[in-house]
Amino acid sequence: MKTYTAVRERLLCLLEEKRMSVHQLAIESAVPPSTIKNILYGKSKNPGIVTLKMLCDGMGITLTEFFQTDTFRTLEQEIK
């Protein structure tokens, strides 16, 4: 799995888990809804760490919690 796919899937999972809409996350994180949608729909394949931190803050989790999943632990190497 590619890193951007893992980020997208994790974000979708957290939105469902926290029962948040894109609009709610945008308000809580101060990240524009268009930016969140670009990540979710694959237009943005390299969201910045600051953006991810803001999204995590909006969901009430840490960056460590965001990345601490089996999916991220087993990501394939991007550069071969």
Predicted regions and their residues:
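The alpha-helix within a helix-turn-helix
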Residues: 15, 26, 56
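Residues within the helices of the helix-turn-helix
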Residues: 12, 23, 53
